[in-house]
Amino acid sequence: KERGIIVTNIPAYSTDSVAQMVFAHLLNIAQQVQHHSEEVHKGRWTNSPDFCFWDTPLIELAGKKIGLVGLGNTGMRTARIAISFGMEVYAFTSKSHFQLPPEIKKMELDELFAECDIVSLHCPLTEQTREMVNARRLSLMKPNAILINTGRGPLINEQDLADALNSGRIYAAGVDVLSQEPPRAYNPLLTARNCYITPHIAWASTAARQRLMQIALDNLKAYQAGNPINVVNK
């Protein structure tokens, strides 16, 4: 800024794709889609005495409490999808009650972890949020709780989460981000019970990547025209 250099960013290009991934993980866990598909291919449905077959709990999302940690673009889009599923939506956010739609209730962080059936992380990584999900907060959660992280890997203490999953302290986790990417072979989440990991692809739909490139081009053209947009160092 002191040297007159304009810095721009590319905002909100992957909002829909990341919110979609939250529910890809959540629906996979709720219905155990991957597991049951694998069991069908092994012949277990063929050998079932009944017209249907399942061997895990099947979870209905309607009426469940989802807690969103952070309510920016992606958090808000996730909230809207959750509302369409008939879920109760709570958020830990700097926004005031007056800034929230009536369907979203504000909650303090520890209360959110204790009261919600699903917790989804949407906050930036700062020194204050680093490893905010740790043994203490995991101990607050319900034994049937689900944790989703499409934000930043270091928001979670991975050993503490693995311990909570392996001990049955919480039911399941779906994560698209890890503290180190690609992960080391000894990352404890790779062998944790009911831990579903995708390789940082929430942002990477074709539509999102096309949008990213288009906004970058728009930023450049606007700068060349003397009317810069998406400036972050005004």
Q: For each of these PLM feature ranges, what is it?
A:
Residues 52-143:
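Rossmann-like dinucleotide/phosphate-binding beta-alpha-beta segment
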Residues 1-2, 95-103, 183-191:
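Short loop/helix-cap segments at secondary-structure boundaries that form the rim of catalytic
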Residues 1-8, 114, 134:
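An N-terminal-biased, well-structured beta-alpha scaffold segment characteristic
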